């Protein structure tokens, strides 16, 4: 689902605020970088710059004394200073590079940790590909700014100021002429810098949107191919590719104009200053050595100005990244450990007049009330889209009811810590999620502690999954592929059931899967589910007649409302729609 207008407006409205120094500093603090590396890098850069500033000053007397012969010692000293400056600058670059990598490492860790702790409703509004862009691209932009552009701009400004000071000492008239020319150059560059800032925001947004579309299509590549939807998928991405192209053209214009315009302005300034310097020599006000020394300082400035220009370019590009990362880190996340620790065993689970809507649009659930006694089986039945899965989402606390409450043993489930609550709940869905990795990793996913091979084989036995795992080449260490594509649907279901056995939940939630399985797989999965349900409070979205008949209580849900409840025989006799649903929709098991 794409971001809604409200989120887009919120981003746009905060644009100016997020690019402020306050938000940038906040973001860097969140990364908890190695400040010592930054200090060492800056100090080394300052030392290298100070050495570089001494060279033109030493050239002045060296040139003026050429009439009396070449001073080999002074020439060697000038060369040594150049080499020393380059070596110290290299050290500064290496240290700052390490600092930058520590920033991006810590920032990515912080952003990733934030992402996985965000509530499910956040992921309903933002594409996963867009979030991947935040994690990869935006953090890299911030790293480039803080590790490269800012230190280089700092040392460049120091070189600029130092050069001006030494030039004032050598010849104030020529320096004054340059000081007058610099604001004119900056005035020329200001519109281009503003243009670059706008491009930075737009490019990052479009790139994130394109990555979202690409991630969505690639994650469902089997659906794309089986539906002959390659052309449709290509067309869907075409608009974003074209948008990125247009932004790229603007960025190319920006990058292309920035340095040449700056360089042209600088060269015109230098040419004018050189002409003025020759005039001063002709009038006896200045020596040739002084002019050459000042020209060397000006050559420093020629290198400085593009660096400063690059800083503004990177600042413009990073401004959007900084804003989006700051917004992400400011999002309210789930608090896993806040609340009571409660043993759910032997307690009654109840819903009291629960209403729910995903947003301000149509209400999904209306006045839902039910009760699940300890170790009982509660079945939810009814037409598709009635709200059965939404009830499960509320029980897993992915969302909060808009009215009413859900209790366990008379205590609101909101008062129980999320970690404690979810650790005692098991969920087996129609299409159980399997992560890329080994069978062992999938069985123990999210569980703390060490599990022996014997523990894993035991739960595989209970889930009727041992035989197919034993026949695999690496058994427990077999890779199942992304989303478990290397194993069948029935095998994925049985692994999910084995995982639920290993969790040993007090409350079990099942969304029966039968329609997509062959008869043999269905039989094995159902036997595993029957075994898993024993001795547990079980809530099941029923698709099989046998489950309905065996349930202690059935709640019939249509259009978000419970229109009937009771045992199977009672509902068949008193609820015509239920009787029709049972005869037409439910699977008759063996």
Swiss-Prot record:
It comes from the Bacteria. GO terms for molecular function: ABC-type oligopeptide transporter activity; ABC-type xenobiotic transporter activity; ATP binding; ATP hydrolysis activity. GO terms for cellular component: plasma membrane. Homodimer. It is found in: Cell membrane. The gene is lmrA. Belongs to the ABC transporter superfamily. Multidrug exporter LmrA (TC 3.A.1.117.1) family. The chain crosses the membrane at residues 35-55, 79-99, 150-170, 176-196, 261-281, 292-312. InterPro entries: AAA+_ATPase, ABC1_TM_dom, ABC1_TM_sf, ABC_transporter-like_ATP-bd, ABC_transporter-like_CS, P-loop_NTPase, Type_1_exporter. Keywords: Antibiotic resistance, ATP-binding, Cell membrane, Membrane, Nucleotide-binding, Translocase, Transmembrane, Transmembrane helix, Transport. Residues 349-584 form the ABC transporter domain. ATP binds at residues 382-389. GO terms for biological process: response to antibiotic. SUPFAM superfamilies: ABC transporter transmembrane region (SSF90123), P-loop containing nucleoside triphosphate hydrolases (SSF52540). Residues 38-317 form the ABC transmembrane type-1 domain. PROSITE patterns: ABC_TM1F, ABC_TRANSPORTER_1, ABC_TRANSPORTER_2. The keyword Nucleotide-binding applies. PANTHER family: ATP-BINDING CASSETTE SUB-FAMILY B MEMBER 10, MITOCHONDRIAL, ATP-DEPENDENT PERMEASE MDL1, MITOCHONDRIAL. Its EC number is 7.6.2.2. It catalyses: ATP + H2O + xenobioticSide 1 = ADP + phosphate + xenobioticSide 2. This is Multidrug resistance ABC transporter ATP-binding and permease protein. The keyword Iron does not apply. It is a multi-pass membrane protein. SMART domains: AAA.
